[in-house]
């Protein structure tokens, strides 16, 4: 999978924000859709506080790596999927996170069966 293409797609979908904001779930988020957790040094930051461009890049690099690892956990043979499927599924995993994305049992089964037509219908 072309990681640069994945990064471009996710950055385009998410946007890039130096200031902490509330996502649609009213959780503090920063950078390129990075959900702030208690493990992050940004944890004490409030909405409107800012981080550097360098920190955004660090968070994004880490989040992309986690997303790809998560896809390899969720799907039997993720690396053998066609690139369009990899990009789509990785983007979904990035947006939703592994715990939520793992609940899409039919979608996961279709992907593992390489049933791309039914997968496309399921996720649209």
Residue ranges of each PLM-predicted region?
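Surface-exposed patches in mature extracellular/periplasmic domains of secreted proteins
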Residues: 18-21, 73-85, 106, 122
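Long, amphipathic alpha-helical surface segments
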Residues: 1-17, 25-26, 34-36, 51, ...
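Alpha-helical segment that forms one wall of the substrate-binding/catalytic cleft
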Residues: 43-75, 83-101
